[in-house]
Amino acid sequence: MIEKDSKILVHFDTNDTSIYQLKGDSISLIKKERVFFNETLIHDELFKKIDYFIEKLRMIVEKVDNESVRLYATGVFQEFSEEEQTQLIIHVFVNSGLCLNIIKPDLEQFYIEKGLEKSNEKNIINGIVQQEFRKVVICGSFQQNMQEIGNIIEILNKRNIQILSPWTMDIVQESLGTDFILLEGQELVNERDAWRHKYDHMNKFKKADAIIICNPEGRIGKGTMFEFGFMVAYSKRIIFTNEPNNLSIPFPYEIGLNFM
């Protein structure tokens, strides 16, 4: 029986698909099924296999949405071209509203090593539960949500997750109440110089395993809205702390962290 307030983690591998329940820091295997994805190219047959499994998931789990369900893929999925991976991710999102996270080999190895610290089994889900991200960027309104951003940073620090940006919580006091908040050590030569700082922040998306967007009550500021295109272009995992309420075009995203 699936417990309330738990998350469902699904791992698609080359020949096996496993469903886990995550409650706190504890995971349990609910179901494991043999599905041969290595016999399928990126076309309708593969799409049907994924769709079929997600439909079966709905029979097991009461709620299947981007807040309660996480999808991870390794093995043959890593061998698809970038465009093929993108088309598969789009298909899953359009048909189910879920995000398919195709794990890069280096991140998969990180998960395996993390998992082995707690178990003798080479299982990426064990590693994900231990530490899901190596590096992240946090986005959100420093003007309005500094306390909430600080709370997230504290949680991430306890998990040994490196925060690429913001690198400090210290704000240049003179910038409070202006259109562009400066962090300690930053200077604004003129209003156009804000673009240099914005670009430096967004350039760190490339090195991050995920972008975490702090949006209490669903609010999304104009600055963060501007950054979405860069996040998607870099094929980054996007996680909101709350359901966003003013997206003009929905795109693949998740809600809530597994460890919060």
Language model feature labels by segment:
Residues 25-26, 67, 159-163:
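A generic structural motif
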Residues 125-260:
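Conserved catalytic or regulatory cores that recognize and/or transform ribose-phosphate-containing ligands
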Residues 7, 68-70, 209-210:
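Structural motif
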Residues 61-91:
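Short beta-strand-loop/turn "lid" adjacent to the catalytic site in phosphate-handling enzymes
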Residues 4-8, 133-136:
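Extreme N-terminal starter segment of soluble prokaryotic enzymes
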Residues 1-5, 97, 101-124:
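Conserved phosphate-binding catalytic cores of ATP/NTP-utilizing and phosphoryl-transfer enzymes
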Residues 7, 12-47:
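Short glycine-rich, Thr/Ser-proximal phosphate-binding strand/loop in the N-terminal lobe
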Residues 48-61:
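Short, well-ordered amphipathic alpha-helical segments that serve as non-catalytic structural scaffolds
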